[in-house]
Amino acid sequence: MSDILAVAREQVLERGVGLDQDQTLQVLQLPDDRLDELLALAHEVRMAHCGPDVEVEGIISLKTGGCPEDCHFCSQSGLFASPVRSAWLDVPSLVEAAKQTAKTGATEFCIVAAVRGPDERLLAQVAAGIEAIRNEVDIQIACSLGMLTQDQVERLSAMGVHRYNHNLETARSFFTNVVTTHSWEERWETLQMVREAGMEVCCGGILGMGESLGQRAEFAANLAELDPHEVPLNFLNPRPGTPFGDLEVLPATEALKAVAAFRLALPRTMLRFAGGREITLGDLGAKQGILGGINAVIVGNYLTTLGRPAEADLQLLDDLQMPIKALNATL
């Protein structure tokens, strides 16, 4: 049998064809002593098909906690005994957060809400926030507001939402182990409506929730079929009070193999470091990931957990001579 990295070099690097599910599984099964070789190839693929620029994004929680869904990783579910309580952010606070995000050089600011889907109150707050931000801050605006109806998709598009995030979270075959209050297919339907409305699709998930390597490869194949503009990769940071609160953190070598494997499966997709990378990878792992396929980062804090200081990520990019993607390059 041909060596999978030799196959990937010819197929992905030279021809630009992503690995299929079986090939991705072979990459995930590589021994640790081939990790450096794997990361180097993933970096070559990223540079060849995406270029050196790194997109920087900040996120803010407009509505925190009190969500009716039972996503087992999430401390914002109202169904679990987690310490997170429901709270809303006002429009001036949204504008200030957007300003601080823009100061980092970020081109993307994502407004997030812990909901099954937006109601009229939330949509009105989002509309007011977007209008206020546009009047004061030069930055692209994304949203992550759960599952949408066709009317809501059209309204968000009319507001000028640049990109919409809705994560599939995990492989289709593993989804019912993670969420039971809605289906994988419902999420998929929202993503299709978003694309048809002309917004960029952002869709990723969380690694380390108990899925097998085969299901991790399946997830990469699911995403390749969806073909989103961006894939955020999160790593489970077990939250107290949630059903996944006692799971072990993913080993760093396993997480880095996944980063590289997803790059080889999705050679032209924006692959973003998201939540959990600090506890899973640490500072060294963050550097290895950016030199192993990653070409976008979330700076600052996440929704309910602390991230690396923005300055640390920006300094790392500077040290690695990775230019931050300019706003005019995204328009």
Swiss-Prot record:
Residues at which [4Fe-4S] cluster binds: 67, 71, 74
Keyword Iron included in the entry's annotation? yes
- Which InterPro entries does the entry link to? Aldolase_TIM, BATS_dom, Biotin_synth/BioAB, Biotin_synthase, Elp3/MiaA/NifB-like_rSAM, rSAM
- Gene Ontology molecular function: 2 iron, 2 sulfur cluster binding; 4 iron, 4 sulfur cluster binding; biotin synthase activity; iron ion binding
Membrane is among the record's keywords: no
Per its UniProt record, the required cofactor names are: [4Fe-4S] cluster; [2Fe-2S] cluster
Which PROSITE patterns does this chain map to? RADICAL_SAM
Q: How is the cofactor bound?
A: Binds 1 [4Fe-4S] cluster. The cluster is coordinated with 3 cysteines and an exchangeable S-adenosyl-L-methionine. Binds 1 [2Fe-2S] cluster. The cluster is coordinated with 3 cysteines and 1 arginine.
Give the GO terms filed under biological process for this record: biotin biosynthetic process
What SMART domains does the entry give? BATS (SM00876), Elp3 (SM00729)
| UniProt keyword list | 2Fe-2S, 4Fe-4S, Biotin biosynthesis, Iron, Iron-sulfur, Metal-binding, S-adenosyl-L-methionine, Transferase
Describe the function of this protein: Catalyzes the conversion of dethiobiotin (DTB) to biotin by the insertion of a sulfur atom into dethiobiotin via a radical-based mechanism.
Family affiliation: Belongs to the radical SAM superfamily. Biotin synthase family.
Q: How does it assemble?
A: Homodimer.
Classification via PANTHER family = BIOTIN SYNTHASE (PTHR22976), BIOTIN SYNTHASE, MITOCHONDRIAL (PTHR22976:SF2)
Q: In its UniProt entry, what is this protein called?
A: Biotin synthase
